[in-house]
Amino acid sequence: MKFTLSALSGLLLVIYTAVNAGEKGTVLWYAEQEAGIEPYKVRYIVSREFMRSDEGSDEGGFVLLDRAEQQIYSVVPQNRTILHIDGRGELPQVPPQLSVEIKRSIDEKVPRLAGQVPVTLELVANQELCYSAIIVPGHLEQARAALREFAQALSIQQSRTLAATPQEYQTPCFLSRYLYATDFHLKQGIPLVDWSQQGHRRELLDYQTGVELDDGLFELPDGFATIEASGR
């Protein structure tokens, strides 16, 4: 699966930057897809303190990352619940029996974005290709850092529940992707596209920097029941 030249050229045409003097954050739009379902749009709103992801509505459900406290909240208005994940803790270390390799390649023919040549990364575990990404180094750093923090928090939570995960699911790709190298691409750049061999795909459609953000987007609703994630 390739991130085509035409797709990158299209992205270059839709990128724009706000000139509002009250610059506070970045908004990104990705097309995301799981195996067997149609792609859907996801909006990521990033500030210095928070990252919110939703499907574009200020009123619907959303996922909120408190960056300083390393806490994740998944808000579901339909049943008035908030799933809480505590992302604090030590990142799990790669066990000796698991070999994790990150392969890196550059195609100079691909158009540059923000002056940088996109880089292709491949996550390989025990010689099996598990995940691929095309990233842009040194661009949209605040958003990249927030996405990495989110991935790390989920990795810590996954490590707490690993013992309850059936052994047949604990494949080298599962372990590397969700525990030991979940941020393999996010530590190097903002993803233009990432995908797995099982049908997951996420592709950057558009972004806007210098956005005046509504603080209310980062507030949890009152009166919702909080459910603690397992493992705590």
Please identify what each model-predicted range represents.
Residues 17-21:
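Sec/Tat signal peptide C-region and signal peptidase I cleavage site
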Residues 22-232:
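Extended soluble regions of mature proteins
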